[in-house]
Amino acid sequence: MRRIVYVSTAAVHGRGPFRGVRPGEAPVAPVSATSRSRAAAERHVLDAGGLVLRPHLVHGEGDRWVVPGLVGLLRELSATVSGCEALQSMIDVGTLGRAVVAAALSPRHGPGAHYVAHPDPVPASELLAAVCERVERPGAGAAVDVATAHARAAGSPRALHHLGMLTVDHWFADDGFWKDLDCSPGEGFAGTFARSAPWYRSYLATGE
């Protein structure tokens, strides 16, 4: 076996905020059981000389957490949320797949942990606007501020989790990763999300 590549998650660092954090700058401090298990798996891979990739938010076909969770939040609120400008590191699933293959085959990458995301972080307001425009628009009510949204979503832990995601920076910077792989990070959020929007609409309508 020439190389081990493990796709983990930036959630091994905990809840943030993280703004422009580079590899090695944030401690591994997982909060959830899932993140703790991934942090433990990372340790085994790194000890064996492997390569760990840490995406934050992965979107596109097959995503059953990020965008469906945001739609669930908007349904809970019957409105969108104003004042959400937190920056999120994002990557579409196709680009992530290319990055994994490139990392496995590249002769230039040694062991270690790297963030894998498009270099341009996405403001939460842009993410929300794209979901409302291309996937599902919430009820006709006016946008609500974060405090009101928190009160309305108080009975839904999942909705509160996604609301928290919109209000806390999770921006991880690792531009050298793409350069070292000689691999393009793709066109960015707007274009890739537009292509996956039909899949999201179908999934949310049918659950398949």
Per-region residue spans from a language model:
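Conserved Rossmann-fold NAD(P)-dependent oxidoreductase catalytic core, especially the SDR/UDP-sugar
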Residues: M1-A33
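Active-site beta-alpha turn of Rossmann-fold NAD(P)-dependent dehydrogenases/reductases
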Residues: V5-T9, R54-H56, A117
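Short glycine-/acidic-enriched loop or helix-start segments at secondary-structure transitions
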Residues: R15-F18, G62-R64, S125-L127
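Active-site Tyr-X1-5-Lys
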Residues: F18, A29-R54
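NAD(P)-dependent short-chain dehydrogenase/reductase
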Residues: A48-V52, H56-Q88
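Substrate-positioning beta->alpha
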Residues: R64-G69, S82-L105, P111-Y115
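Residue-level signal for the nucleotide or nucleotide-sugar donor/cofactor binding architecture
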Residues: Q88-G94, V122, F172, E187
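Mid/C-terminal beta-alpha module of Rossmann-like enzyme folds, strongest
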Residues: A99-H161, G188, A194, L204-E208
